Amino acid sequence: EIGGTVGDIESLPFLEAIRQFANDIGKEKTLFIHLTLVPFLKSSDEIKTKPTQHSVKELRSIGIQPDMVICRSQQSIPLDQRKKISLFCNIPIKRVIETVDVKTIYEAPISFFNEGLDKQVFEYFNIKPRKKINLKPWKDVTKIVTNKNIRTVNIAIVGKYVDLKDAYKSLDCLLYTSDAADDA
């Protein structure tokens, strides 16, 4: 995972490193997955694919062709828009994976599974899955985490950047998951 925005100067050394890595070990042993936001504009009631097209173009300009695109959106992306992403990003339609925003990050793997992300990774590397994937434990955890009837406890976090939502994200997640584990 590189993180950030494609084209930002901070990420360029890392992008160059993974480009060289792919060349060194061989393209058949690497899979570039590009996570992109596909915004929905309420004012025009449409999904915009242009930002995704531009970010893939930017990746290509530095020598990286994504093999798969995961499109994050507020709502389901119509097939014609997915085909457009496929066409202009030079990625097979089956590797244009959508993930609609979920309530909690614990739902994301279930969403990816439902979209066939695992199958596409297996197929890309020519790997036969050994057994059927059992998502029941993951679904159980998700159910616990999304349960609205859990008790609440007030905990104060004292720090310099408490007004910034993500400043203490890891601590927030730790407290959240420890409570879910306690309810399990």
Q: Can you annotate each of these PLM segments?
A:
Residues 2-4:
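Switch II (G3) loop of P-loop NTPases
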Residues 10-19:
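His/Asp/Glu-rich metal-coordinating catalytic cores
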Residues 21-24:
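Substrate-engagement module of ASCE P-loop NTPases
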Residues 30-126:
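Internal gly/pro-rich beta-alpha loop/helix module
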Residues 33, 154-156:
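Conserved beta-strand elements of the Class I
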Residues 93-154, 161-170:
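Flexible inter-domain linker/hinge segments
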Residues 176-184:
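Single conserved hydrophobic/aromatic residue that forms the stacking wall/gate
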